[in-house]
Amino acid sequence: MDPKISEMHPALRLVDPQIQLAVTRMENAVGRDQNNVGPKVYPIILRLGSPLSLNMARKTLNSLEDKAFQLTPIAVQMTKLATTEELPDEFVVVTVK
């Protein structure tokens, strides 16, 4: 695993086994998917207690695969108010298993 990406923090509860989460700074995540082989990066601003969906992600979709993946809900909720250290820049990297 990339040392720039931390393990999923307890502040996030991941329900869907088909999706993995990693917390990282956006500048570390951008560029990892340039050849469409790496993880798909979706910057998401987290809201306490709110389920997130990829429809909330701000990403330019340039392939049908991305469009299909965007419609898949991310079963993630904030379980507590996270600090900046726990969720740097409030961005999450979402990848498909």
From Swiss-Prot:
Every copy of the 9b domain together lies at 8-97
Chain span(s) of sequence motif Nuclear export signal: 45-53
Q: Which SUPFAM superfamilies match?
A: SARS ORF9b-like
Q: What is the effect of changing residue 10 to S?
A: In strain: Omicron/BA.1, Omicron/BA.2, Omicron/BA.2.12.1, Omicron/BA.4, Omicron/BA.5, Omicron/XBB.1.5, Omicron/EG.5.1
In the UniProt annotation, what is the result of changing residue 77 to E?
A: In strain: Gamma/P.1
GO biological process per UniProt: negative regulation of defense response to virus; negative regulation of mitochondrial fission; positive regulation of autophagosome assembly; symbiont-mediated suppression of host cytoplasmic pattern recognition receptor signaling pathway via inhibition of MAVS activity; symbiont-mediated suppression of host type I interferon-mediated signaling pathway
Alphabetized, the UniProt keywords read: Host cytoplasm, Host mitochondrion, Host-virus interaction, Inhibition of host innate immune response by virus, Inhibition of host MAVS by virus, Inhibition of host RLR pathway by virus, Viral immunoevasion
What CDD domains does the database record attribute to this sequence?
Answer: SARS-CoV_ORF9b (cd21955)
Of the GO CC terms on this record, one is: host cell mitochondrion
Q: Which Pfam families match?
A: bCoV_lipid_BD (PF09399)
What is the annotated role of this protein in its UniProt record? Answer: Plays a role in inhibiting the host innate immune response by targeting the mitochondrial-associated innate immune response. Acts by binding to host TOMM70, inhibiting its binding to HSP90AB1 thereby disrupting the interferon activation pathway.
Subunit details: Homodimer. Interacts with host TOMM70; the interaction occurs only with monomer.
The name this protein carries in UniProt is ORF9b protein
What is the species of this protein? Severe acute respiratory syndrome coronavirus 2 (2019-nCoV)
